[in-house]
Amino acid sequence: MERQNIRIRLKAFDHRVLDNSTREIVSTAKRTGANVRGPIPLPTRIEKFTVLRSPHIDKKSREQFEIRTHKRLLDIVDPTPQTVDALMKLDLSAGVDVEIKLGA
């Protein structure tokens, strides 16, 4: 029989919210008897935006803003039906983007 696994990829702008959501998923999966690999921290994507400070003059005066996207990866190996049900019922924070892929 093939080993089935669930790959969960989480993204968020705030790393504290992301870590809390990751902790919830790991504890839920372990509580239902699944084997969890991770969380694996993936590289943080940094987008920088440079704008002029003044709308009229002084081209040399600029201001920079950045958006950091933090990412984590989880693998749940051999999930039980209870694991899948518990993960579906799990209520995560609003600022976390969750991608779930089922694989063999």
Curated annotation (Swiss-Prot):
InterPro entries: Ribosomal_uS10 (IPR001848), Ribosomal_uS10_CS (IPR018268), Ribosomal_uS10_dom (IPR027486), Ribosomal_uS10_dom_sf (IPR036838). GO terms for molecular function: structural constituent of ribosome; tRNA binding. One of its GO terms (cellular component) is ribosome. Transmembrane segments: none annotated. Signal peptide: none annotated. GO terms for biological process: translation. Involved in the binding of tRNA to the ribosomes. This is Small ribosomal subunit protein uS10. It comes from Maricaulis maris (strain MCS10).
